[in-house]
Amino acid sequence: MASQGTKRSYEQMETGGERQNATEIRASVGRMVGGIGRFYIQMCTELKLGDHEGRLIQNSITIERMVLSAFDERRNKYLEEHPSAGKDPKKTGGPIYRRRDGKWMRELILYDKEEIRRIWRQANNGEDATAGLTHLMIWHSNLNDATYQRTRALVRTGMDPRMCSLMQGSTLPRRSGAAGAAVKGVGTMVMELIRMIKRGINDRNFWRGENGRRTRIAYERMCNILKGKFQTAAQRAMMDQVRESRNPGNAEIEDLIFLARSALILRGSVAHKSCLPACVYGLAVASGYDFEREGYSLVGIDPFRLLQNSQVFSLIRPNENPAHKSQLVWMACHSAAFEDLRVSSFIRGTRMVPRGKLSTRGVQIASNENMETMDSNTLELRSKYWAIRTRSGGNTNKQRASAGQISVQPTFSVQRNLPFERATIMAAFTGNTEGRTSDMRTEIIRMMESARPEDASFQGRGVFELSDEKATNPIVPSFDMSNEGSYFFGDNAEEYDN
């Protein structure tokens, strides 16, 4: 990235900090996850959860959602102004699962939001600790990315289901800040912008008046975030055009869809962070681990090491495969929903299957599901190796535009060849190169056509033994060229729709 000097590292975004050196970053990220852990322990005490119950990922998710809801100011304000039947704007809650007489029981709990906020602040030295909240949002987003497909959302905005590997972070709330923006895929940003432009087309007052001015600022900011993800001058120039448009309309939507397609080959840079469920941090804090003193990083060995020594349980439905449930959660923990399965399998040390072959549904249990038949299992979240998380997009050659893997947005900085069928993608680019962006379009298409699939991405980068915490001996895996490793192959997952 040419602009590396002006960028803050993810951890600085994550902790809202200004420039810090590596030790300070590790300490502030440690403080953040330590606060999450302390909060979780306190909530388990409040709810009188036993050890097994506190390690249940479904309970962790309920507790995480409660604190996110307690701090969702915009929604809280909305709920107070639009009282709806049966919703107390001052309360939050969800299902808590308890073990009773050898069976799992569901109990719906309700808490004052004020009380939850107090417990959260107390666990975070009296601060609001928004970084910790964002961290939980990203964990939920990563879980959604691994669990659901967004075909319907893609089609609704005029995009193509084949662009699913660009959709990281598509369920992140707007309020997720800089750390959230860093993990959003190109497709996610394009979709947010298209929705905005469509509102402007349908509502004449959208860009007008005092409100419209704020809307315009948000629009330009989103354009700049997306521009920053692109790595070639032509793609960025096209984003400038979209941003500067007097009155954004269908021409801009066309440009954005073109850019999203181009990102299938000329990948954008999208950050990846291993965000773990709150109960994992809780377990570590409870066992006496001092995150702030030891320091912590979301992109190095630390999350792998934490998962090696954490036992987390999950409820399993009668016909689900526990190994598949574990794969789903492992992918969510490492933000690997869009990674090449060959790479993930190598790191995890077990062969991972595409989503179409998984015998498991989502982690969360709907309120109408029968608890009688529910069992619980240990999730296998350990790995054989660890690898550094990347944000590069995996283009093979930084100097000239070059190819990244088509149906993959790399998570790990590990060398892989690029099996890709360029013809299928290029077919999407027939026709329209007129209009004001024609020269940029022509340039982008030229770059894509000259991209060579035989190069390897992340040349010389490898995985590391779990004992190699300083990353001194990279082990460069060799992969079978023949099978492209997209997780979405033969996809039949449920849609994510709130």
Swiss-Prot record:
Assembly and interaction partners: Homomultimerizes to form the nucleocapsid. May bind host exportin-1/XPO1. Binds to viral genomic RNA. Protein-RNA contacts are mediated by a combination of electrostatic interactions between positively charged residues and the phosphate backbone and planar interactions between aromatic side chains and bases.
InterPro entries: Flu_NP
Primary localization class, coarse: virion
Function: Encapsidates the negative strand viral RNA, protecting it from nucleases. The encapsidated genomic RNA is termed the ribonucleoprotein (RNP) and serves as template for transcription and replication. The RNP needs to be localized in the host nucleus to start an infectious cycle, but is too large to diffuse through the nuclear pore complex. NP comprises at least 2 nuclear localization signals that are responsible for the active RNP import into the nucleus through cellular importin alpha/beta pathway.
Any Pfam family: Flu_NP
Single GO MF annotation: RNA binding
Keywords in alphabetical order: Capsid protein, Helical capsid protein, Host nucleus, Host-virus interaction, Ribonucleoprotein, RNA-binding, Viral nucleoprotein, Viral penetration into host nucleus, Virion, Virus entry into host cell
Origin species: Influenza A virus (strain A/Equine/Jillin/1/1989 H3N8)
Gene: NP
Family according to the record: Belongs to the influenza viruses nucleoprotein family.
Keyword RNA-binding attached: yes
Protein name: Nucleoprotein
